[in-house]
Every structure is written in structure tokens, then in C-alpha cells.
Amino acid sequence: MIKKISLLTALSVTAFSGWAQETDNNAMVVTANRFQQPVNSVLAPTTVVTREEIDRWQAKSLTDVMRRLPGVDIGQNGGLGQKSSLFIRGTNSSHVLVLIDGIRLNQAGISGSSDLSQIPLSLVQKVEYIRGSRSAVYGSDAIGGVVNIITTREKNGTTLNAGVGSKGYQSYDAATQQALGDSTTATLAGNYVYTKGFDVVAYGTASPAQPDRDGFMSKSLYGTVEHKFGDQFSGFLRGYGYDNRTDYDNFSSVDTRQLYSQTWDTGLRYQSGIYSTQLIGSYSHSKDYDYDPLRGLHSSGSTLVDSQQYNAQWGNVLQVGAGTVSAGVDWQDQIIKPDSTSVNREESQNNTGIYLTGQQRFASIVLEGSVRGDDQSEFGWHNTWRTGASWEFIEGYSLIASYGTAFKAPNMGQLYGRFGSNRDLQPEESKQWESGVEGLTGPVIWRVSGYRNDIDNLIDATGSTGYVYENVGKAKIKGIEATASFDTGPVGHRISYDYVDSRNAITDEPLARRAKQQVKYQLDWQVYDLDWSVTYQYLGSRYDKDYGNYIPAVDDYQTVKLGGVSLWDLAASYPVTSHLTVRGRIANLFDKDYETAYGYRTAGREYYLTGSYTF
């Protein structure tokens, strides 16, 4: 079930879930402060999505999961597998830190941002999603928020899934988790997804017609072994990889993207009484090809980004009084190999971070703080900090306030790429304020927050800079987020409203591809054994650029306005037996035609049917 943080729950006898139909006081999260704590004790707005909910919604991608959550706006160049941008509270997609099992996703490539459309949904067992700055906990990138993808399965057993759908969609996956003796657990899972896709049609004045199907195929494999060496020591070894192929329309050509990615993690954990510690090491390697399918993967016109990333973490947690303190060290090394067509030679950068976080409760007041220092090989030392507090001024009603700093380090392409790179770039920097109130009024659990985010030293390359990357930009973001949940008999309701005014602080123009207003509504209803789910989303109007229409007088591309749209999804599931469940979904029920990225169509109405067998 989804869990939306409600501060009053941390201070009240009864814990309520602002985003769940049922209450689970034992739900734990680790993302907010890098120590395990009840979901109802975190000050920052936090949402947890479980595998149970992903199955109930019958989501087909991680972007499909994220688009339903408060503060999230998705811009995507077409359908399943097409390039996507995740905007949290109006910030850039590169301002979102994506973790997999608490370890940074490999972002050593040229763009420096995470494309969630490429992460197989079959890997995802839980999502912990934090809104607001978290650089004082994790370092670079966490300006808009943090998304932590958990792959660990909660219980043993075997699951077989098969699904079909519109546009030639097929999905097959199998997973098993078994105990090997009293101390060892092993998990193995595999997945295959394919769709013929549709013509996403990149329109532009410089673009010819490209009548084709832009399909997607993904194959993934996952395995892990966990072992308990005793009551206090445990360890794990985990590996996963995926092979994705995406056909897409560029503004001047038909292209194919081929992405190979593999990751290996291992770690040791120790816990004794009020103290625990863990040491984790990780290695990931990805090869990202872009090529003309008529000429082949290794043709002269193809491009390759061959990147590696090494991570090491040592974290310590100590229970102190009515709270917890966490401290540790992170180390990361990113490498682009010399056979990459995006750089002239092998390039690397490394970062070492030291952090301290803590939370304490004093009667009706909760205080939280974190501080971190990062030593980066290119720009040196950078400090960040964050503090927050809540006060239950009346039983069941709380005031919350926080302030924090954050930063985003220049990515590898901006520092070392063949076009416009600049080794003298400095980090993008952010200052964020947030305040809010939440309460329980009758059956309704609600929260209203207002926030402001000022971002300086934004990196850009324009004609005025000679098309060389410079720290020349500024952004000013103001917003309001309101959430509520309540039950009416057997029906659960969850509603969120987002108002985001995200602007270029120099020109006062709206930032591209971000809707000013969004409304999201989720209804879950179980009638006898039939489980219904209705999802509504209103996407307000947004602005984008027509990259086929350059205007020299203003050194920019023409701005275009994309209209708003209302979308409905309908899903239902029925347990035929205690082992077999059949699910069906209609996405975009009323077949609305809309765009979240200019020139790129969306899928229209789609139908899906899935069978799941567990034993």
C-alpha cells in the first residue's frame, strides 16, 4: 500500500496512513535519513508504493507508477520504453537522485540523469519516494527529491506472470525465492517485455515524416543470495542486468537505442542492541548504443557511451534517547571508457562524502537535521545541510517547517564531452524552504504544504556562451501541494493537487514540459472477490520548445504551448483460485490525444490482460 507521511502520526498514539486504505504501523523506510524508521515518523513528504499496489494498478512501466504520485510530472517522447523525464516539484530531471537498494543508479553517462523508462518494472518490489532536498544526506543530485527502488522480496514462493495487450504488447516473467537451509535465502527472477509500439512521430519544421512503429523490447535477469552468519551478522550478494532495445523517431532520422546494463552488489551487516553498521560495495557497467537500424549497431554513424561506476558505503546507526543518529562515508568513482564516441579519451571523476543525520522527539516536538561534506575530484569540497521541525499544536494537528541546501555536480558530458565541455564548471546550487500543516478531520487525513526552491549556477550552453557549457542559469520554483485520503464504506479515496510555478529566474519564462497544475485521484474498491481500481489524472497546460524552429534573434527555439488533458484508467482483478489471479486494464479510457513532449504522440486507449500464478 502507498504510505504518505503524516506528521501527526509520529506524535499520536494511533498511526494513520495519508495514502493508504489500510493502516500498517509496521511499515518501515530507510531512504529519508539512511536509517530504518517507521514510515509515520519521517518529517519530509514521503510516499511508499508496494508491489501489491503496482499489481493492483497493473502498471506497465516505472514511469506509469511514478506519474500517479504527488509532486511528479512525467515528460515522455512517446510510449513504452521511449525516453522520459521525471520532474519532481518543478525541478529538472537531473535534479532527482535515483537509488536501487540504496545505491546510486549508474549515471556516469553523458546526460547525467536517470531515464526511468529503461528500468524493468519486474525488478521493483517497493518504491520509497521522498520530496524535497536530500543532498545533506546523499550528496549530489538530490535537489528535487529521491526515488529509492527496492528489489528485495518480502516472502518466499514462486510467481509466474503472462500478459498481452494492445499494439502487440507481451510480457512474461517468473520469480522464485526459496530458503536454502535455516540461514540462507536465494532469489532468481527473469522477465521479457515486447511491444510493437506505434508511430510516435517527431514533428518539426526540420523533420521529414517517419511512418513506422517505434517498438520496445526488454530482457532482464535478477539474482540474490542472503546468508545469516549468526544472530548479529548477515551478508548478501546480488546481481541484475537488462538488455533493452528502443526504436524511436529523432527530428531528422529513424534511430534505435540499445542499452546493456549490469550491476553487482555485495555487503555485510552487523546489529547488536542499539547499534548497527553495514558495509556495501557495488559495481555497474552499461553500454548505451545509438544507431541507424538500416546500417547496424557497429556502423560508422552509430554512437556509444561505455560507462562504469564503482560505489562503496559504510553506514552506522545508533539509537539515542527518543531518536536515532546515523553517520557514514560514501565513495564513488565514475568512468567513461575511451571507446565511447562521446569522449576523446578515458575520463573519470570520483567523490567521497561524509554525512551525519539525526532525529529526536521531545513531547509534541520532533526535530530533524543532517549535514554532509563532499570532496569531488573536479571542483573540490562542497557542504550541504538541512533542518526540519514539527509541532503538534492541537491533538491531531501539526505544523511542519524545513530548510535545506542541495547541489548537482556537473555531469560527465558537460565536463569531458566532445562538444561544449568545460572542466571549470561549478555545481548547481539550491536553497529550499517548506512549511505546512496536516491533520485528521473526521475521516479525512490531509496535508497542505507550500515550498520555494531557488537554484543558482544552472549549467547551460547557448549562443551567448559560444555553445560551451557555463554556469549561467537560475531557476525560481514556488509551489503548493495538497493531499487527502478517506474511506467511504468499502471504497478508499486518495486525492492530490499540485500547483507548481517553475520559471527561469533571468527571463521569467516557464520551465519546459512542466504542468502548472495537476490533480490526481485514486479509487480502490473491493466487491466480494473483485478488486476495482480507478485512476484519474488532470494534467494542466505546459510549455515546450519546437526544436525544428530556431529563432536567431533570441538565440532560442520557438516556444509552443501544450494543452491540458484529463485521463482515466480502469483496472480490475479476480482470484479464479487461491493460486491464479486474472487482471484486466483499460488505459486512457476515453482515448484522449495529448502530448507531454512537443511533437511526440502518446499511446491512446490501450487494453491489457494478465494472468498470475503463485505457489
Curated annotation (Swiss-Prot):
Ca(2+) 1 binds at residues 199, 210, 212, 214, 249. Residues 155-615 form the TBDR beta-barrel domain. It comes from the Bacteria. InterPro entries: B12_transptr_BtuB, Plug_dom, Plug_dom_sf, TonB-dep_rcpt-like, TonB-dep_rcpt_b-brl, TonB_rcpt_b-brl_sf, TonB_rcpt_CS. The keyword Signal applies. The keyword Transmembrane applies. GO terms for molecular function: ABC-type vitamin B12 transporter activity; metal ion binding; porin activity. GO terms for cellular component: cell outer membrane; pore complex. Cyanocob(III)alamin binds at residues 85, 92, 110-111, 303, 513, 547. One of its GO terms (biological process) is monoatomic ion transport. A motif (TonB C-terminal box) lies at residues 598-615. Belongs to the TonB-dependent receptor family. BtuB (TC 1.B.14.3.1) subfamily. This is Vitamin B12 transporter BtuB. It comes from Pectobacterium atrosepticum (strain SCRI 1043 / ATCC BAA-672) (Erwinia carotovora subsp. atroseptica). The gene is btuB.
